Amino acid sequence: MPGTPSLYAAIDLGSNSFHMLVVREVAGSIQTLTRVKRKVRLAAGLGADNALSADAMERGWQCLRLFAERLQDIPPSQIRVVATATLRLATNADVFVARAQEILGCPVQVIAGEEEARLIYQGVAHTTGGADRRLVVDIGGASTELVTGTGARATSLFSLPMGCVTFLERFFTDRSLTQEHFASAEQAARDILQPVIAQLRGQGWKICVGASGTVQALQEIMMAQGMDERITLAKLQQLKARAIHCGRLEELEIEGLTLERALVFPSGLAILIAIFSELEIECMTLAGGALREGLVYGMLHLAVDQDIRNRTLKNIQRRFMVDIAQAGRVAQLAERFAVSVEREWALDDLSRALLHSASLLHEVGLAVDFKRAPQHAAYLVNNLDLPGFTPAQKKLLATLLLNQTGTVDLPALQQQNAVPLRVAERLCRLLRLAIIFASRRRDDMLPDVTLTAHDDTLTASLPQDWLSVHPLGAEMLEQEQLWQSYVHWQLDVK
């Protein structure tokens, strides 16, 4: 049976989990159709002689039988299957790989550590915003990849022999979570890091992103607990203290930590603490993609877009038939307003960039219906895949769109954690006013309005007689003053 030409599949035979990603290309990006993940814990089957046990191999083959059914619909030339650290180490890897290829009907490539690091970096570069120099950290089941680079180009690639499964079996064998066990795991990780620290520091970076299950788990924990999404050493130490307090792995309970991730969380946490300490990392955020995305984008031969957020915004505007000219007017006004109050209101570049993004998407809900358009817009943004935006940033965008007009939902603004609450409130106010002043949908009808701020009092100064000449606009502003006053936001119009 012929395959579907537009489909691509990437399979990652990892040391902890096997993953399958099936996508199709849409407008220079990828649309995910299927994600399948199974905890195989292949690394746990490595014996002292580095031979894989029969049980571990059978767990892997059983998982691949599930994957094989889906691969029947995809041309073999559009499938890539790679195996990583455990199968690099296993003395009987050829036995596992030969049977795996029979099951899948396509080649399985055991890739070197540096190639794994390169693919991880490509996946990050294609899916994670920012043009600055970056450090990418991926803690796998049996290896940890550390990569520095700028844009599409990796400048240093390292694959180190430490992972959350191998460290679990080595340092938490009895499943007790003690200070001593953590200390031993952290010291071992520091020792492994020593030969590469100088070169990594020499490359330097401005942003650090994590692309592993450990970092995903941390993100889920922080979101569940209402913290901001920035991972810091202080937060890692707090989580370690919580784990030690729980005492045993089977009793590990941390709000936001799923049962599926709990088993290898302490060992991954110990490795990450060592990385933060040795490389003096200030903060880390979650990457948008990693190895599997790197494989897919490699098959598609797509160039890395230096402005991933802009590509994402344009794709959404096109998909939902947004009036691009009107979105641009609102974005232009919102930026003008932000510039006029940025010093008084301490709006940084990221906050202004997120305001710009919200402005460009504010009418996306009209594609569903005019009624409840802000709610539709918020739902869409919350649930769409937005490469270049972190989960917390997506939530902020959705919250701003929800509050673009009408009664202000203050609890929704309080629940986002991408920016401080006061900043979120201020971005909301600027967006609402930009939408009002651009409501005539014509460039020549944009008023020469000036915004000034003093603490939380916002003053809109309009040309003489503007209010009398534009009675509908005056009424909209009067209503907006009321809505803002309900949440104790002072808006003066003169």
Curated annotation (Swiss-Prot):
Pfam families: Ppx-GppA (PF02541), Ppx-GppA_III (PF21447). It is an enzyme of class 3 (hydrolase). Its EC number is 3.6.1.40. GO terms for biological process: guanosine pentaphosphate catabolic process; guanosine tetraphosphate biosynthetic process; nucleobase-containing small molecule interconversion. Keywords: Hydrolase. It catalyses: guanosine 3'-diphosphate 5'-triphosphate + H2O = guanosine 3',5'-bis(diphosphate) + phosphate + H(+). Pathway: Purine metabolism; ppGpp biosynthesis; ppGpp from GTP: step 2/2. GO terms for molecular function: guanosine-5'-triphosphate,3'-diphosphate diphosphatase activity. InterPro entries: ATPase_NBD, GppA/Ppx_hydrolase, Guo-5TP_3DP_PyrP, Ppx_GppA_C, Ppx_GppA_N, PyroPPase_GppA_Ppx. Catalyzes the conversion of pppGpp to ppGpp. Guanosine pentaphosphate (pppGpp) is a cytoplasmic signaling molecule which together with ppGpp controls the 'stringent response', an adaptive process that allows bacteria to respond to amino acid starvation, resulting in the coordinated regulation of numerous cellular activities. Belongs to the GppA/Ppx family. GppA subfamily. PANTHER family: EXOPOLYPHOSPHATASE (PTHR30005), RETROGRADE REGULATION PROTEIN 2 (PTHR30005:SF0). This is Guanosine-5'-triphosphate,3'-diphosphate pyrophosphatase. It comes from Cronobacter sakazakii (strain ATCC BAA-894).
